[in-house]
Amino acid sequence: MTTRETIFLYTDGAASGNPGPGGYGVVLKCGDLRKELSGGFALTTNNRMEMLAVIKGLESLKWEGARVEVYSDSSYVVNTMTQGWKRKKNHDLWARMDSLCARFNVTFHWLKGHAGHPENERCDALAVAAYSRPDLPADEGYNTGESQELF
């Protein structure tokens, strides 16, 4: 693979309850190569999982400067990255995403979810399977608002 080849990154995030157990699913494609990633947390939100799907996909790439086409059904992610929506929450993940996007030539595309797109459907299945696993870890960046900052 060369940096001139386009990498297609399909993502989805899901949560059972919002907040609740959540998962992300990723499908990466480049030429004949394909890779799938997934993971989940015991208590999180769908938006955090949508963001984490993009982050985990970008973190898995080894070619600095590669052209990456991100396809997500999350208007939250796509419009924040392309239309400058205000970032009120999830600052930890936005910082990670910005840092990763700076390493690649990334373009974001919105794609209608649950509309029969094979890669999006696969990402959704991976996300749901991930949050259905027992003994999910804590999402350390998720703040339930129950704890107060002391300083």
Q: Each predicted region: which residue ranges?
A:
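A short, polar/acidic, helix/strand-boundary loop motif
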Residues: 31-49
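A short acidic-Thr-Gly-centered motif at the start of a beta-strand
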Residues: 1-4
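Structural detector for hydrophobic anchor residues on beta-strands
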Residues: 9-11, 24, 37, 51
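RNase H catalytic domain
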Residues: 6-21, 55-122, 126, 130-131, ...
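Short amphipathic alpha-helical face segments that pack within enzyme cores
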Residues: 48, 52-56
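Short beta-strand scaffold segments in enzyme catalytic cores
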Residues: 23-30
